[in-house]
Amino acid sequence: MIMTMMQTVRAWQQESDVEHRKQHKQRWRPDGAHISAAYDLNSDNDDGHHRVVHNQNNGSPNSSPNQSTSAFRQRQPHHPPTGQQPPRLPCTVTHFSAHWKTLLILLTLLSASTLTASANVTSTISPPINGSSTDYILLYGESTTSLVPALTTGLSGDGSGAVIEDEEDAEKASEYIFDRTDVRIIFITLYTLVFCCCFFGNLLVILVVTLSRRLRSITNFFLANLAFADFCVGLFCVMQNLSIYLIESWVFGEFLCRMYQFVHSLSYTASIFILVVICMERYFAIVHPITCKQILTAARLRMVIVTVWITSAVYSTPKFVFSKTIKNIHTQDGQEEEICVLDREMFNSKLLDMINFVLLYVMPLLVMTVLYSKIAIALWRSSRGLTPHVVQHQHQQPQQPSCQDIGMGMHNSMYHHHPHHHHHHHQHHQLQSAASSAGVVGVGLGGGGGGGPGPSLASGGSSTTSLSRKQSSKYEKRGVSITESQLDNCKVSLEADRPIVSACRKTSFYHHGHAHHQRAGNASVGGGSGGAGAGATHMSHSSSNVLRARRGVVRMLIIFVLTFALCNLPYHARKMWQYWSRSYRGDSNFNALLTPLTFLVTYFNSGVNPLLYAFLSRNFRKGMKELLLCSWKKGKGKSSSNSSMHHKRKALQTHSLPTDTTHIGNEQL
């Protein structure tokens, strides 16, 4: 097009030069005199003839006044020497007139070519309908709605802005990366795996926590809400996000488009907020157990969960308001295509994404890093004194452990609700005082009393002792009931609590067995030197388990923080690159693949949460196994459970000592 315009202008310039040479001619005579001639432009000389005015006065040209109005006369320069070429004529008004005409014609052609090129680009280049919603800008005219890509793919890749005229090049430039079969297979496989983790994994967590009586606690209540939020991510976000890139048109309607954007933001936001709440609950339960008992009651924790969901819903409301479906009629086959996008002209997209980056990534990551670091430091420091020598010294001079020391031993404090819990609260403290007077304290797990449920270890451990025959007959039934409650509490503990629970159970069984072998009839347990030596052996073994467990908790906390940071970083990094870097190209194949991959990694965090927070617990795995096998082992399991409880009660009443306390202590977890 530009070459055609240049050739046309050059032809017009040549015609103008010919016309100018016709109007101004200069003829030289052999004697050196010159003749100035001009064509008369009057209507009298339409035949093309011209008048020649001879000048004989020293060779200088002269024009008649009568002809000045009807003919154009050019004053000639002096006669040049013989043998030299005559000088060029200076530019005249006719030259300016011809140039102005040329400029006007050139400007007209340029404007016409610009309009034609823009019309061709608008009509021939259609946006990739399967692209991400972030790569579109919605332009609303007075009567029509057009959808234009943020970076037009119809331009050449060198950035020069030249329009692709070759049809073959245009087809290559408009080829969509997700139309390739291998790319489709890879993404369908990856999205299916993430969907299965999010859907089935979190659904299993919800069922196990809800149906298993042993897992009904406040901490698991948080995990169940986290699993529900991640379950919504798998149900409403994963496959819908994949469909944007694979199908040609949104077929679910405008309302479901709004609901998709709303639920996508709601579940993602609630999942992050619940992770922060779980982190805060663990911090108070481990580092400040007494404060946790006073502040984090069951009613308040339920209000916290309700507040999290309401806040997430309010925060996600703009996604419901600004979402809509857009019809694209500029397709090659003439069919209408519909996509679900956010109307980014109704709000500041950059500002909203920056707020999401701060509230949903930076602040949660900072809070979890600080609190989990404090938990790790507290557990690591408390593990320094857990050596056999120190434990033996503490056993020889027994003293009741503090709430903070016990709280540090439980990285996941559990909250329990027993029907007889508050009824036996007074007798529970009587037994504690009796055990303290006897000089022996077990590392038991007691339920919290008072105004609400509290941490099991933070409320003071219930001591397991053998009283005198007279006192034992009075509290025998209640004492057995409390011991069974302790065993149930031990079962609810998570994986990292196993060493301390083992110590609890070993100490309890040891004291009962030692009382059975004591034939002197004394009322206290472990008062003799033999009891101290045996107790030191058991406590030395349990202290090493506690040390390993606490260091394992530190490693697990690091995994929690790193998982959240790594899974959510790619999405926010891509957003920051899109807004703050000039090298970002939304039309490139790399970015076309990068966008769904960042979503996929974010969804993977919702799929891996149940693996980290639930499946690492042996107690949870037992509850899951019971849930899966309860259909055909229901009767057998019930009979075996009753028989086991009968033998357990008989063993406690007869004060018999099991032969392998380590096996029994670990079997319950």
Curated annotation (Swiss-Prot):
Compositionally biased intervals (Low complexity):
55-74, 390-401, 455-470
Biased composition, class Gly residues, residue ranges: 441-454, 524-534
Bias-annotated ranges (Polar residues)? 1-15, 653-669
Keywords assigned by UniProt, alphabetized: Cell membrane, Disulfide bond, G-protein coupled receptor, Glycoprotein, Membrane, Receptor, Transducer, Transmembrane, Transmembrane helix
Q: How does it sit in the membrane?
A: Multi-pass membrane protein
Q: List the disulfide bonds.
A: 257-340
Please give the residue ranges for the topological domain Cytoplasmic: 206-217, 291-302, 372-552, 617-669
Q: Does the keyword Metal-binding apply?
A: no
The residues that the database entry marks as glycosylated are 66, 120, 130, 241
Q: Name one GO biological process term.
A: cellular response to hormone stimulus
Q: Where does the UniProt entry say this protein principally localizes?
A: membrane
A Pfam match? 7tm_1
What task does this protein carry out?
G-protein coupled receptor which is activated by the Trissin peptide in vitro, leading to increased intracellular calcium ion levels.
What's the protein name? Trissin receptor
- The coding gene here is TrissinR
